[in-house]
Amino acid sequence: ILLTSGSLKEYKEGIPAPLISMYLESKGITPEKSDFCTILFLAEPGDKEGKAKRLVSALADLEKAFEENRPVSEILPECSSLPEEDIRDLSSRFFHFLHEKNVFSLLNTLFSSEHFPDAPMTGRKANQLWLSGKGEKCPLAEAEGRTTLEAVLPYPPGICLLAAGETWTKDILSYFLFLEEYGREFPSFMPEVVGLHKQDGKPYVWVLSKDRG
């Protein structure tokens, strides 16, 4: 696991994990998964030493580019969606945004057992109700207290935050609303959110209909 230092209070600087992932993929190296500040690499029994050296070499090249504060467009010329700014400026803006939105504290809350959502029904029952037409579209901002009919998770990292049959909580809703804002600020880094749909540019989710009759 690679931990980017911008997530740690004792370090003032770091490189966004999504940017590192994009850079490595441009070099033919695909991480297993990543989030804001961590990247997971899997080593297999048959891997050669050269594979690890290739990864370390690519990371060293990116570190050098960071130290030289090179333009992001120069580091990843094939990615036109990235902003026109130097890598230190982008990294600083990225971590400032995360800390300003207090996202690390929110994530700790989401994965604390006392904050897990209630499940008024099983996932199987939720799926049956959805297939039988007992669901309705709900604007994301109005989802608190409603029962979701499908799993909702950002990918990467691919960790389910809300399973079918569970209830949207204030904290879970806050996180997905944060992701919407994050996507507007850093569109190139926005993860795919399974279970979140768009209609006329506005996010909505499928929930149990208030009128099931």
Feature roles, as predicted:
Residues 1-213:
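Non-catalytic terminal extensions of PLP-dependent enzymes
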